[in-house]
Amino acid sequence: MLKVIARRIDQFINSQSAGGVLLALSALVALVISNSPWRSYYQQFLQIPGSVKMGADWLLLSKPMLIWINDLWMAVFFFLVGLEIKRELLNGELASLKQAMLPAVAALGGMAVPALIYAAINWGEPVGLRGWGIPMATDIAFALGLLVLLGSRVPTSLKVFLTAVAIIDDLGAILVIAFFYTDNLSPTMLLAAGLGALVLLGLNRARVMAVGPYVVVGLVIWVCVLKSGIHATLAGVITALAIPLADGKGGSPLERAEHALQPWVAFLVLPVFAFANAGVSLQGVTLATLTQTVPLGIAFGLLIGKPIGVFGASWLLIRLTDAQLPDQCRWSQFFGVCVLCGVGFTMSLFIGSLAFEGADAAYEVQVKIGVLLGSLLSGAAGVALLLASRKAV
């Protein structure tokens, strides 16, 4: 059983690390184009209109390319996140209280402290305060990609720990989006989405093992959630949680769906999201821009808040209970991984797009600068600390 779990984690890590490289390249290309003579073409691409219409007025969705990517494209990513969360809770590193305690407490600390640091820096700025959820997230693709590049210098137990923390972070981000970044709720559409969720539950109880029916109902829920005022990507999570873990014959519909979807998310969905959202013009960016409260709060939250929260909460748990460090891991290595948790990128950019939706365009630039700066510094510092801890043996 342990060998199966270890092999599954290795496969997951390998796909995430390769996807992380492509994710970084996509963000870099977007950044370069946004600061080149071709930046107008980049903006035109993001504003390409797309419409879906069914019936007379029953369904009419008309959005630019950027919104389609953030609303529909990312729902696929959240579907995969939902599958990962369910698997880990039922049959993975989070399946038992003893296994889950350290990464769960670490993740909670890693979400709370960055949010508090951001809020403290932006206190007295009503619009700026809306971004408190931005530095809470960890980008599992980027962070694991950096760990894998270090090879045997980092024990496998730390990679498993980082995976678990990032998954719990994703769960926290989902709850933050659901409860804090929603407005203009439509009771009718919420009721329709709720009925759709009941249909999913019925499919699960009826032991329907084919994933197709769940996806069809999930698309209907996506439309209802989109029109309800809650962010539509949450439909992906709702759908994923209904997929059965086991079929009673030794197979797992959930794991089959997860393994089939992972390469598409790693090599297509997330790189496209990064390309569409990481482009920011640095023209006119000065030291004064970098010291605005929003980018400062994000960068400090990721670079300082994340390691303090993850490491501090873990240290307290280990000192006060019988919890232990991951196997074959030293405190110096553990701290290096805690710093890597500050690589926020994908989810941070996504929450930023929700937090300042409808606000002045300057906030969008500030969010991207803060996320890029905080994630880059966290990645560099984490790798340096892990290399130094290896040499100190």
Swiss-Prot record:
The keyword Membrane applies. InterPro entries: Na/H_antiporter_dom_sf (IPR023171), NhaA (IPR004670). Its main location: membrane. It catalyses: Na(+)(in) + 2 H(+)(out) = Na(+)(out) + 2 H(+)(in). One of its GO terms (biological process) is regulation of pH. Signal peptide: none annotated. Na(+)/H(+) antiporter that extrudes sodium in exchange for external protons. Belongs to the NhaA Na(+)/H(+) (TC 2.A.33) antiporter family. NCBIfam families: NhaA, PRK09560.1, PRK09561.1. This is Na(+)/H(+) antiporter NhaA.
